[in-house]
Amino acid sequence: MMILSPEEIEVLKLSCKVAAVCLVFSLIPATLVAWVLARKEFWGKSLFETLVFLPLVLPPVVPGYLLLQLFGNRGLFGQYLAPFGLEFAFNWKGAVLASAVMGFPLLVQSIRLAIELVDQRLEMAAKTLGASSFGAFMQVTLPLASSGILVGSILCFCRSLGEFGATITFVGNIAGETRTLPLAMYSLMQQPDTEAAVWRLIILSLSVAFFALWFAQWFSRYQKNKRGYSA
């Protein structure tokens, strides 16, 4: 049985907290953006879409540095937020923001693909029966896209757990405050005689990611089978 040290347990708790808060604050905006990209046509859509997915192709250090310039204590926005207690640089809230920026495109893409697979005629039928656009979305689109939303949520959560470049650039590597799983592994690899601890964290990361992705695949198949039986 693998026994974690108190420091490793603290790292795991912090990583899960950062990933969970990131997902909670990303889910509604990502669903809205995904719906807009899936259902609406407007001038500048290609530019908007490019901006949404840009973090996927940028070196993670670039978004991290931009976040530091924007939300650092002396940043463009950070200097005005700091007096209200909203400080992001070099604390766990900044780690949430960095993870959200890097995981948001994955969440949007998964939800967008799920919404695009929903037959728009079902939405129109709901509206014909008296549902508003919002009601049709909540009662028809959202339930039918639930498997894609779950998969996207798990991908975003796992991406947050593995975020390194943007996090270390924006919030540093502070024990007990911003040191998540990948940062802890990086720190241990800089020290002698820590191979066993590194392997424990690697096995822990693999276990969490494997279980999360397995559950997403299982739930997706379950939903498909359920709809097949319903039909």
Regions found by a protein language model. Name each.
Residues 72, 149-187:
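Non-cytoplasmic
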Residues 24, 108-111, 119, 133-166:
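Transmembrane alpha-helices
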